[in-house]
């Protein structure tokens, strides 16, 4: 990224995890007969650019990286329309918004084409990928060609959870509202699959961001690392440099984080790998703003303000 382009990323905070509910996305859901409430367990939140800008001002956010909402859409035509609308929004507010492109995964050829178009023609800063797309998880070797294309361009890759295909939805609360349990579960499943299948070793130039304070990865790191080693010794899986792969990951703070989550995350990730995120509008403005004082005080007390709010994000965007 050029010095001129990087100027727009200076400021009090960079929000690395936020969404826009665009008309093209809502139209795509209707055309594809996808019921967001049925799939996610809650309706799409209301969104407008005016409300988002007001939220940013209230929260002290100078620049936001937008991505498509959930449910994930794998339709190639819809992905193009959504990316074009994101690009238009960012052209209207170039010092406020950037975006990461939607890819029609698991369509590999279509995703490579859309990645190139979105980054070369529309100005996308990278891509958003679902933890699984129609049951094909990140780390699946069938997705290697798209990761090779992303790796070639040192691409930013922001992971977002998607519901697993088979869930215990009846009489089990965790299967009804995805954000409660299934989102962090599926993110964790996807990243462990990437580590097990050496995605980060094969494609070392990828800049991968794991959402929601790492989901369950801080808890799982030691267990998974030990299990991978044991399984390899039993010839049940190929040897994997688990620690080296894990160290490559970045983590955002989206999802109403608390000090306890920071403590756990810092046991497995270095401070320069943590970036600020809000998950707006899925986390409503009043919730983010209600936590703002506590969040700011905790970050300030630990001397992390510039690192987490600005410096780490700028380094990731400009690297």
How would you describe each model-predicted region?
Residues 19, 162-163, 214, 281:
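Catalytic metal-binding/acid-base residues of hydrolase active sites
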């Amino acid at each position: 990224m050029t010095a001129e382009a990087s100027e727009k990323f200076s400021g009090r905070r960079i929000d690395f995890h936020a969404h826009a509910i665009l008309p093209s996305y809502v139209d795509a859901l209707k055309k594809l007969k996808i019921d967001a409430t049925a799939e996610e367990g809650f309706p799409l939140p209301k969104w407008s650019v005016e409300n988002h800008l007001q939220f940013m001002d209230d929260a002290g956010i100078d620049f936001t990286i937008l991505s498509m909402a959930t449910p994930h859409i794998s339709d190639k035509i819809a992905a193009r329309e959504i990316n074009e609308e994101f690009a238009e929004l960012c052209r209207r507010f170039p010092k406020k918004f950037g975006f990461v492109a939607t890819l029609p995964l698991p369509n590999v050829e279509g995703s490579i084409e859309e990645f190139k178009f979105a980054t070369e023609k529309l100005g996308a800063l990278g891509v958003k990928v679902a933890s699984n797309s129609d049951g094909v998880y990140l780390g699946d070797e069938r997705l290697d060609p798209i990761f090779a294309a992303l790796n070639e361009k040192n691409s930013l890759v922001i992971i977002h959870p998607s519901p697993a295909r088979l869930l215990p939805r009846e009489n089990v609360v965790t299967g009804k509202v995805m954000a409660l349990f299934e989102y962090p579960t599926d993110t964790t499943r996807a990243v462990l699959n990437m580590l097990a299948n050496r995605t980060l070793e094969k494609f070392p130039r990828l800049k991968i961001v794991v959402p929601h304070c790492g989901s369950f990865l801080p808890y799982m790191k030691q267990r998974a690392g030990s299990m991978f080693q044991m399984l390899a010794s039993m010839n049940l899986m190929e040897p994997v440099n688990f620690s080296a792969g894990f160290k490559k990951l970045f983590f955002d703070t989206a999802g109403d984080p608390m000090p306890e989550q920071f403590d756990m995350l810092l046991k497995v990730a270095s401070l320069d790998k943590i970036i600020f995120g809000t998950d707006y509008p899925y986390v409503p403005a009043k919730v983010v703003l209600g936590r703002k004082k506590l969040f700011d005080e905790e970050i300030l007390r630990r001397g992390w303000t510039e690192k987490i709010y600005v410096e780490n994000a700028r380094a990731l965007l400009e690297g």
